[in-house]
Amino acid sequence: MILLEVNNRIIEEILTLKFENAAAGNKPEAVEVTFADFDGVLYHVSNPNGDKAKVLISISLKFYKELQEHGTDEVLKKVYGNFLVAPESGYNVSLLYDLESLPSNKDSVIHQAGMLKRNCFASVFEKYFKFQEEGKDGEKRAVIHYRDDETMYVEAKKDRVTVVFSTVFKDDDDVVIGKVFMQEFKEGRRASHTAPQVLFSHREPPLELKDTDAAVGDNIGYITFVLFPRHTNANARDNTINLIHTFRDYLHYHIKCSKAYIHTRMRAKTSDFLKVLNRARPDAEKKEMKTITGKTFAAR
């Protein structure tokens, strides 16, 4: 299986190029790039007020207000410090980099810029991991509508943190492949006792969402992760956040890859069958044609 990159490579490549050119004393060039990421996220990289010596990176998330309720602003201030500036119009978060004053830890700065989307998500998980660590129970469940018709729920207990993703399958085939895919996670837990418990429910929400307005339908699926202290402690939580916040994209990416692989195999088999049929086809019987004098026509 393929793990999707947590960081945004486009941002990292742009900043790396800008920092290297600035360090070499080259004349700065203009940049104006707008691009999308998973979950409807939009990025904009530009020169503020046309100043080529400065690079502004902005991100737009439709669900940012819900993240703010769980301390995203504070987490971003902690991670980005002075690079964090007032957000550009139409965006939620902006980072400003001055090419005339390069940081000493350029590699770390570039990496964190590429992790902007992940760091926006992180506050929700960090908050509930801390609730579990402190033994708090009964805290209000976090509800993040990370896509127009899909939702993430996070809830903390004294001994665990439960994360539930709702997802919509566009085709009936996706449901079948999704079920097979999720079965692999169950098999994986048998092989590794340190893996989190993963549950999948189709049509109906899990018991954790019993009294909520969680969607119900033939094309709705719910993936539940049960995270224990070994997954949420200070040493493991960063990696847990990296993996779990991209899980929905990871699932649908592999569903599409599986369908593409099946279609490729089907086309290859069809081609093989056609070759067999062509070899088995009997040759057409040649009809001998003669003239009135009895001579035979010969093809030239």
Swiss-Prot record:
InterPro entries: ARPC2 (IPR007188), ARPC2/4 (IPR034666). GO terms for biological process: actin filament polymerization; Arp2/3 complex-mediated actin nucleation. It is found in: Cytoplasm, Cytoskeleton; Cell projection; Nucleus. GO terms for cellular component: Arp2/3 protein complex; cell projection; cytoplasm; nucleus; site of double-strand break. Keywords: Actin-binding, Cell projection, Cytoplasm, Cytoskeleton, Nucleus. SUPFAM superfamilies: Arp2/3 complex subunits. GO terms for molecular function: actin filament binding; structural constituent of cytoskeleton. It holds the Pfam family P34-Arc. Actin-binding component of the Arp2/3 complex, a multiprotein complex that mediates actin polymerization upon stimulation by nucleation-promoting factor (NPF). The Arp2/3 complex mediates the formation of branched actin networks in the cytoplasm, providing the force for cell motility. In addition to its role in the cytoplasmic cytoskeleton, the Arp2/3 complex also promotes actin polymerization in the nucleus, thereby regulating gene transcription and repair of damaged DNA. Component of the Arp2/3 complex composed of actr2/arp2, actr3/arp3, arpc1 (arpc1a or arpc1b), arpc2, arpc3, arpc4 and arpc5. Belongs to the ARPC2 family. This is Actin-related protein 2/3 complex subunit 2-A. The gene is arpc2-a.
